[in-house]
Amino acid sequence: MTTLFISDLHLTPSRTDITECFVQFMRNEAVNAEALYVLGDLFEFWIGDEDCTPFAERIRNEFKALTTSGVPVYFIQGNRDFLLGQRFCRETGITLLDDVCTIDLYGEKVVILHGDTLCIDDLKYQEFRKTVHQPWLQWIFKRIPWFIKKRIVAKVQSGVRDDKQHKSLEIMDVNQQEVAQVMSQFCVKLMIHGHTHRPNIHHFEHDNLPLTRIVLGDWYSQGSVLKVTADGYSLEQRPFFTE
């Protein structure tokens, strides 16, 4: 059997190529998996579980069909869909996991996370993350009318784009010491995360222990899937479908 990992799809109505690739992946590949893990940023931005647009319903239906078929789906919130909550999970049958957690992957303990918490050198982002994850602020936001939410999110997205243009790639990448600290904290030799859009498999040593960090890829120009079996793992691309 195979366990699949994806992240950073950034699904949005305007990118039908990404959506179609995702749908084909769910129907033709994920349906045959032992489990599917989505490690954040499934959506370009998720405003709230009350989203009932045709696009949101289509994505819900794909997850519902998969879980109904017997494939468990696990989800970790990313920096763009941290408002995805229990209502979405109930409607789709997926399971929401903690921001950082460990799983048993064919006998090996593995730590999985979205990855933004590893980018501790980006102080401005970490402060922003701390603010938007305040329970009281999320409580207020969930009760704001939908049209106002959309305006707030549009302004936030514009600010994020402007901010990224003035940051170095090094600042937006993970901090290696933080990676080692988290892996040591959870006593694991393998970490899987997304967020940085830099798909790769990194082998390194810490305290004389061989460690591995797998970075999932984004779906901007092609799909990206991590396939894990009892015999090993492979980070693979999935081409977009062209008419």
UniProtKB/Swiss-Prot annotation:
Mn(2+) 1 binds at D8, H10, D41, H197. Gene3D superfamilies: 3.60.21.10. Coiled coil: none annotated. Pfam families: Metallophos (PF00149). GO terms for cellular component: cytoplasm; extrinsic component of plasma membrane. InterPro entries: Calcineurin-like_PHP_ApaH, LpxH-like, Metallo-depent_PP-like, UDP-diacylglucosamine_Hdrlase. It is an enzyme of class 3 (hydrolase). GO terms for biological process: lipid A biosynthetic process. It catalyses: UDP-2-N,3-O-bis[(3R)-3-hydroxytetradecanoyl]-alpha-D-glucosamine + H2O = 2-N,3-O-bis[(3R)-3-hydroxytetradecanoyl]-alpha-D-glucosaminyl 1-phosphate + UMP + 2 H(+). Its main location: membrane. It is a peripheral membrane protein. It comes from the Bacteria. Pathway: Glycolipid biosynthesis; lipid IV(A) biosynthesis; lipid IV(A) from (3R)-3-hydroxytetradecanoyl-[acyl-carrier-protein] and UDP-N-acetyl-alpha-D-glucosamine: step 4/6. Belongs to the LpxH family. Hydrolyzes the pyrophosphate bond of UDP-2,3-diacylglucosamine to yield 2,3-diacylglucosamine 1-phosphate (lipid X) and UMP by catalyzing the attack of water at the alpha-P atom. Involved in the biosynthesis of lipid A, a phosphorylated glycolipid that anchors the lipopolysaccharide to the outer membrane of the cell. This is UDP-2,3-diacylglucosamine hydrolase.
